[in-house]
Amino acid sequence: YQFEYTGTSDDDLLIGLESGKYDIGTKGAWYTDERAKKFVIPSEPVGASIIGFTVRKEDEQKYKTIDDFAKNKGKLVPISPQNAQWNVITSYNEKHQDAPIELTAAESFKVADAYAWVLEGRYDAFFDIKLSFEKAVTAEDGPYHQYADKLSWFPYKGIPTYPLIHRDEKGEK
């Protein structure tokens, strides 16, 4: 086999797959019913993303688990309803109706905004992927490393990831 690779943004990848510009995309995509309608998704995952919460270091004793965050009525940075992270929090809330996490819909924002909003106290946490936090904040060459002594991250769970395949006759095979 010979593959042609194209580096692109997450949004462009999804649009490109849907339009047929790309045949397959790997972006650490989580399974959602909406994605399963648009794309062919293999039955077996190829990896996993560890999702968790970026919080202020001063709050790391207060928020050690998702249950702590919910019980303390932590305020979460808004999430786009199209983002698979929305489904993760919705699923948590369905199972924990006594102490749900308030979800606020967002159109879009920059990750730098999310970190800044947590630091300034506008929100208590940003629902973040571990690898993203490590590359952006904890890595010495990370673009937000200046926040490393002010932010902390704790895990929620691992979520299987899948390649997404353009839905057409060729992709169905």
Residue ranges of model-derived segments:
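Hydrophobic residues within well-ordered alpha-helices
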Residues: 17-18, 53, 69, 117-119, ...
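Bilobed "Venus flytrap"/periplasmic-binding protein-like clamshell domains
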Residues: 1, 52-110, 131
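Extracytoplasmic small-molecule ligand-binding "clamshell" domains
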Residues: 1-29
